[in-house]
Regions:
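Conserved N-terminal catalytic core of the sugar/cofactor nucleotidyltransferase
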Residues: 1-39
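Active-site-adjacent loop/tail segments of enzyme domains
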Residues: 18-21, 47-56
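Short aromatic/hydrophobic "clamp" motif used to bind/position activated sugar donors
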Residues: 42-43
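Conserved core of the sugar-phosphate nucleotidyltransferase
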Residues: 3, 51-140
């Protein structure tokens, strides 16, 4: 931790904040650390998503003036969804209004602190915590490359994005359906 603090000092970064046992505790620790110089907005990102694109950040930042407390990147859900337990399918879920939620999530600092303050429930992310308090959440376009590392095999999916990309070329073409 000392070495990380030294690096942060050298590059004039905020010093690292010790996380908690849960996401809620870790985010709250970070929010508390920022209290002295409270920003208007914060971006909360989980380290399980190592790829954040400039476009997603631009989408979030451009939305600041739209008077939402929280803005999140989303992707449409392409796969079929089912509810299953005990090795049986029990329900077909309509995917038409379902989306994949990503991070970073842009939140109003004061509202997020207020939501975290006396909260004992566990929420998957900041948008679900704020929604539980009756706050409407805005969405912007996410990026499919912002994969979440949950299982060991997920690292293999990320390899093309994290290794030398010189073997990849950009090809632009036109096409049409007949």
């Amino acid at each position: 931790l000392r070495k990380i603090k030294d690096i942060a000092h050298k590059y004039k970064l905020l010093e690292p904040i010790i996380g908690g046992d849960t996401r809620h505790e870790s985010v709250y620790n970070a929010l508390t650390f920022l209290k002295k110089d409270a920003p208007e907005f914060v971006l909360v990102h989980d380290s399980a998503r190592p790829i954040v694109t400039k476009k997603v950040l631009e989408n979030l930042i451009e939305s600041i003036n739209l008077n939402y407390t929280c803005v999140i990147p989303i992707l449409p859900l392409n796969d079929s969804i089912r509810s299953a337990y005990n090795n049986e399918i029990h329900e077909v879920v309509n995917r038409q209004d379902k989306v994949i939620v990503q991070t970073p999530q842009l939140c109003n600092y004061k509202e997020l602190v207020k939501a975290h303050k006396n909260n004992i429930e566990i929420y998957e992310d900041e948008s679900s915590l704020l929604m539980s308090k009756g706050i409407k959440i805005m969405t912007v376009e996410g990026d499919p490359r912002s994969l979440k590392i949950t299982y060991e095999n997920d690292f293999k999916l990320l390899e093309p994005y994290l290794t030398n990309n010189s073997k990849y070329i950009t090809v632009i073409g036109n096409g049409f359906d007949i």
